[in-house]
Amino acid sequence: MLRIITCICLCFLGGSIAQAQRLLPKQKGISFSWIAPAEAFTSSFSDDFGVQLGYSINAKRGNYKHFALEYQRRLYPYKSLNIPVERYIGAGGYSFALISDSSKTVALNLGVEALLGYEVVNHSKSLLPDGALLTNENNFLYGAQIGLQVETYLSDHFLVLCSGKVAALWGSSFELLRPCATVGLRYMF
């Protein structure tokens, strides 16, 4: 009788789906994201973009520390010209898990980051081709960023990231608040 019960239990255990544990503390990940500023959605085509390379370290309860390097480029129209503004930013912060399903396949997080960077206006050239003089200068930037991020596991190691963020950057002669959307991929190891 014991042999029959053991065989039945083994059949039920073998038929269940085995899933890897996710969001383990001290698990690390590398991510690559594409950044689209909010202004990119108002026109039919925009050359404004950004990229981000990130590194994350999981903490407890689905929270994690996040560090990233970003490059952002935005074109400001002036007569028939486009004046490029490039931003090189380092970010570091913490992401808090707000809600997730029981298998941790889909999660919604709130992230807060400190930002530090440098802004280059028109490739450091203040004189425009028509003779006009730019009053905007290259500057160091500092600020903070807050955003909501949806993370979805494609497999036990790959995640798709979608987020909406708003950054407040001081030190720039351009706008203070900069909303953006990001889409990316993270590899957990």
Predicted regions and their residues:
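Outer-envelope beta-barrel architecture signal
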Residues: 22-30, 61-67, 104-110, 138-140, ...
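Cleavable N-terminal export/targeting peptides
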Residues: 1-27
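Outer-membrane beta-barrel "beta-signal"
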Residues: 177-189
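Short glycine/proline- and aromatic-enriched beta-strand/turn motifs that initiate or cap beta-hairpins
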Residues: 19-69, 73-74, 186
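Acidic, glycine-rich flexible loop segments
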Residues: 134, 141-152
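Gram-negative (and chloroplast) outer-membrane scaffold detector with strong preference
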Residues: 54-129, 158, 187
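Extracytoplasmic loops and strand-loop junctions of Gram-negative outer membrane beta-barrel proteins
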Residues: 33-38, 75-77, 129-134, 165-168
